[in-house]
Amino acid sequence: MGLTLPALHTHTQIVGGGGRPFGGKKHSVEPVQKRSYEANFYPVFDDSSPPGADYFRELARVSKRRIIWGGNFFLEHLDTASCLIVWDKKRRGMDQADCEIAGTDLPGQSRIFDFRWNGMLQGDMKHKETRIHATQKPVALYAWIYQRWAKAGDKILDTHLGSGSSRIAAWDAGLDFWGCEIDKTYYDLEEERFAAHAAHQNLFLL
């Protein structure tokens, strides 16, 4: 796998697998907005090799609970999958998926989060998010997850940081957060996005 996380059962929850899709082909996706040369295109990446059993064993070693986006492809790697999280993107008749599914080992029943994510149309147009990543998820989705399943003192790890939406929501909720991103271009864009969000929020604290 090439990754060994240092802490043993210290991260309370993992919200992983959200930064990279796996479908057996290479992707090169045009972003919605062009802010700089680096953002003019998403780097081509090979998604033909989804995480194997070693990846999920490592997640289990360092976590107590796991939320894995795209988890409908990895249910055999979760101890229990009675609670699925479904993000309904409120779009129908498109050539893309109507929803995304996270496999979890959380207790309880499956839950649905409704939030439009259809081109330029988003569920919260007042706080519309600039798209910087091919599989970007809204901050509101992670905020809802943390509100429902996280508590003060929890530590969050995202092994596929991507656009950094999970990090922004964790920061807003006052949760400790660790993130990993394999692609430097995505990491730099995520850092820029997070810094802008934190600076904006800090204005209200002055």
Report each predicted region and the residues it spans:
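Class I S-adenosyl-L-methionine
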Residues: 5-206
